[in-house]
């Protein structure tokens, strides 16, 4: 299954609610969301900076990955999020090799 990285920034209201009732949202919210689409949570970390939470998930496809983020966004607890598709080293090299085929046909606008 493909891997995705979610980066999530909470709203101030969400932080206030979490401070009143501290719990590991990685386990109580993220893991069940992944499992609901037939995937699994590989790992999750709280962080500081532009985002408050980073998750690595293994879900069946783009549709499943989008479903998780749509449901989370609809809940209103996020002020920003970012989803990144992750590739293995082998997949990255495979993509590099395929650029030769694309380069033969692609003509940039100039």
Stretches found by the model and what they are:
Residues 1-110:
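A compositional/biophysical signature of low hydrophobicity enriched in polar/charged and small residues
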């Amino acid at each position: 299954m493909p891997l995705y990285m979610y980066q999530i920034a909470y709203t101030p209201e969400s932080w206030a609610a979490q401070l009143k009732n501290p719990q590991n949202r990685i386990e109580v919210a993220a893991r069940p969301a992944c499992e609901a689409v037939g995937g699994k949570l590989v790992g999750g970390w709280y962080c500081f900076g532009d985002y408050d939470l980073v998750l690595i998930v293994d879900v069946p496809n783009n549709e499943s990955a989008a479903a998780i983020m749509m449901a989370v966004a609809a809940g209103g607890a996020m002020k920003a999020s970012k989803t990144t598709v992750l590739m293995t080293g082998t997949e990255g090299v495979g993509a590099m090799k395929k650029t030769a085929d694309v380069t033969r046909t692609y003509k940039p606008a100039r």
